[in-house]
Amino acid sequence: MSIAPPPLSVLLELTHRCPLACPYCSNPIALAALREEMDTAGWRSLLQQAADMGVLQAHFSGGEPMLRKDLPELVAHARALGLYSNLITSGVAGGEPMLDQLQAAGLEHVQLSVQDVDAAGADRIAGYRNSLSKKREFAAAVRARGLPLTINAVLHRHNAERVPGMIALALEWQAERIEVAHTQYDGWGLRNRAALMPSREQLLATIDAVETARRQLGDRLAIDFVTPDYYARQPKPCMGGWGQRFVNISPRGDVLPCHAAETIDGLRFDNLRERSLADIWNNGEAFVRFRGTAWMPEVCQGCPKREIDWGGCRCQALALSGDAATLDPVCERSPIHAQVRATAEQESASPAPAFIYRRPERPAAATADPLE
């Protein structure tokens, strides 16, 4: 039996149910049904086990976590255990009564997704009418209760030029932080890659917009920025390193090293109904397989950054090369690095295909705009 340092944070994907249908959603293509979701007792046990291990943060996510009526109870339990609680939400479900309950339960932070600053563009991405106005109302309710607010803005070819507007929106809504993140191509994002991929010119413009805003705003607004991997020369560390800082719990209670890990065939993902969190974290096949550096191919073993990027993303390696155990193909040392860049350039230069919206039914078929 091995003992690994405990994760810093646990992400509780309480449900895959969501009012929105964003085509870049990181949830898996095979969404969990309501009947498959872990019950309240299961989530409470998970929080207790996490606290016992030394985990510091509990992030309540989904889907849309505010669709779970037991969310206030779970937040209160996290608070009682000394876990920092963060809500990751679309802001269009639950409303002020639920927010009051969450505040009373001890919720400490809210992350609110924003699809676009253009109302029509926001509705088109979300597949949900009047989404921006509802998010504005929710943000105002969050700030009226004195809760810290972070705006999560996901970028792609259809909204990349509106980064300055997104930053202005964060200021208007009195957010303390904004995360401006290009789409990461896993889950539904991978399925919609050709519809979402920005051009290199768009990427450079977003970099310039963020750097300009940082200079102008100083400490008035914290701005986090995540670039798209496909134009990179070096990979990003997956969740701070596979099985090192982060653990993800699916609605079914499966324990995952990252939210996309289930795409890797051949790995066994243990469930909390059958095994303890600590045992899974320390000894579970899925966590041990790519933890550390022993698994790395020779080209990674000799790299001075091997304990910085940890070989990059295993799910992306599988998606682009067919082998989860090879180096991330966005790395310039990869034999298919140029092919990855060429794919991005070709897709971004081609007409964008229709979105495949995130829906539990008929996930493999291209769908019409749900707003039409």
Swiss-Prot record:
Top-level division of the source organism's lineage: Bacteria
Domain Radical SAM core residues, every copy: 4-220
UniProt entry keywords in alphabetical sequence: 4Fe-4S, Iron, Iron-sulfur, Metal-binding, Oxidoreductase, PQQ biosynthesis, S-adenosyl-L-methionine
Reactions catalysed according to its record: [PQQ precursor protein] + S-adenosyl-L-methionine = E-Y cross-linked-[PQQ precursor protein] + 5'-deoxyadenosine + L-methionine + H(+)
Enzyme class: oxidoreductase
PANTHER family associated with the record: PQQA PEPTIDE CYCLASE, RADICAL SAM DOMAIN PROTEIN
One matching Pfam family: Radical_SAM
Record organism: Xanthomonas euvesicatoria pv. vesicatoria (strain 85-10)
Chain's role: Catalyzes the cross-linking of a glutamate residue and a tyrosine residue in the PqqA protein as part of the biosynthesis of pyrroloquinoline quinone (PQQ).
Family per similarity comment: Belongs to the radical SAM superfamily. PqqE family.
Upper lineage: Bacteria, Pseudomonadati, Pseudomonadota, Gammaproteobacteria, Lysobacterales
Pathways involved: Cofactor biosynthesis; pyrroloquinoline quinone biosynthesis
GO terms for MF: 4 iron, 4 sulfur cluster binding; cyclase activity; iron ion binding; oxidoreductase activity; S-adenosyl-L-methionine binding
Binding, [4Fe-4S] cluster: C18, C22, C25
Required cofactor(s): [4Fe-4S] cluster
Any GO BP annotation: pyrroloquinoline quinone biosynthetic process
Ranges for region Disordered: 342-372
Subunit structure comment from the entry: Interacts with PqqD. The interaction is necessary for activity of PqqE.
Enzyme Commission designation: 1.21.98.4
Protein name in UniProt: PqqA peptide cyclase
Cofactor comment: Binds 1 [4Fe-4S] cluster. The cluster is coordinated with 3 cysteines and an exchangeable S-adenosyl-L-methionine.
Alphabetical list of NCBIfam families matching this protein: PQQ_syn_pqqE, rSAM_more_4Fe4S
Keyword Iron-sulfur recorded: yes
